[in-house]
């Protein structure tokens, strides 16, 4: 259920431009948003308003676009909003999905000599900087008894990271679904570790401050998103086929993604989730991977409308 928000962030009035269109940043791999786009459910709930879908390769790019006003709303993993807030970007957390700890992993070649996380020492690890894979790698390195300086991170977007991994330019690849599932289905990888026990792999929805002031639009968005998730859960084969065709993925890959994915209703950030996200920020700050410490609660949306707070 939508309950009272956590933190001190308060929304301002929406900008006049927000009444004309709603621009959503998404990754093709974000199933709920992809299905929402395919169903047209949001467009039906916002008659007379143009919904613009803008595709990005990963969460950091979505939040950069959000920060400069190119999109109004987007979904990312745990690390991108931490990096954005530390860089002074004015964004608000407006919702979160349940954890998906089995949906990201560190991959190696089947015949690689790496057998434990400690074996990452001195190795080149491909990952998207500032992404959930970045936090997974940080946690994995620590679990292996290593310092961050003990590995050689190679910062690449997902498609470039896969190419580097396949040609042997890197020793390991930290990645999330559906890229993870696609690599598994292709059979040319071995899982060194998943994020289970290392990171909950949370998904967050973030909005511009102006959109956060338009609670009716956010209410419509989350209602439509619930409709998309119900479609995924209630018509799994149909949804899988639609998503596979849309994303250019094999059906087996999408079904593998769905096996690891529980129902994903969006809810406000609870105090526990804010604390968990604060830990993500603190870990990055201690390692000097973000320019300054941050207080996550300062960027958590506080809806004014009691109907929005109770919205499910």
Describe each model-derived feature in a short phrase.
Residues 40, 44, 64, 68, ...:
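Solvent-exposed, polar/charged alpha-helical surfaces in well-ordered, non-transmembrane soluble domains
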Residues 97-108, 184-211, 222-225, 260-264, ...:
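Periplasmic-binding protein-like
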Residues 11-144, 153-155, 171-175, 191, ...:
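Short, glycine-/small- and polar/acidic-enriched structural segments
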């Amino acid at each position: 259920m939508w309950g009272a928000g956590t933190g001190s962030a308060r929304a301002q009035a929406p900008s006049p431009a927000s009444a004309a269109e709603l621009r959503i940043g998404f990754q093709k791999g974000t199933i709920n948003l992809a299905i929402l786009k395919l169903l047209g459910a949001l467009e039906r709930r916002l008659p007379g308003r143009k919904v613009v879908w803008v595709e990005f390769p990963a969460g950091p790019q979505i939040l950069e676009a959000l920060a400069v006003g190119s999109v109004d709303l987007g979904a990312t993993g745990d690390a991108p909003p931490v990096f954005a807030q530390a860089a002074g970007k004015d964004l608000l957390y407006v919702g979160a999905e349940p954890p998906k700890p089995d949906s990201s992993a560190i991959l190696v070649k089947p015949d690689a000599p790496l057998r434990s996380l400690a074996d990452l020492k001195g190795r080149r690890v491909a990952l998207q900087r500032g992404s959930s894979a970045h936090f997974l790698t940080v946690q994995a390195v620590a679990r292996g008894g290593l310092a961050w300086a003990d590995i050689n991170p190679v910062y690449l977007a997902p498609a470039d990271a896969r190419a580097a991994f396949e040609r042997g330019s890197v020793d390991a690849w930290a990645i999330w679904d559906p890229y993870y599932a696609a690599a598994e289905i292709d059979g040319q990888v071995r899982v060194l570790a998943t994020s289970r026990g290392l990171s909950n792999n949370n998904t967050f929805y973030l909005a511009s401050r102006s959109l956060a002031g338009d609670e009716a639009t956010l209410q419509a968005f989350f209602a439509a998103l619930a409709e998309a998730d119900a479609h995924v859960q209630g018509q799994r084969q149909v949804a899988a086929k639609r998503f596979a065709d849309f994303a250019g993925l094999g059906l087996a890959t999408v079904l593998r993604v769905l096996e690891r994915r529980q129902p994903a209703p969006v809810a406000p950030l609870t105090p526990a989730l804010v604390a968990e996200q604060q830990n993500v920020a603190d870990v990055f700050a201690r390692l000097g991977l973000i320019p300054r410490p941050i207080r996550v609660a300062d960027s958590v949306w506080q809806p004014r409308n009691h109907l929005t707070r109770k919205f499910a």
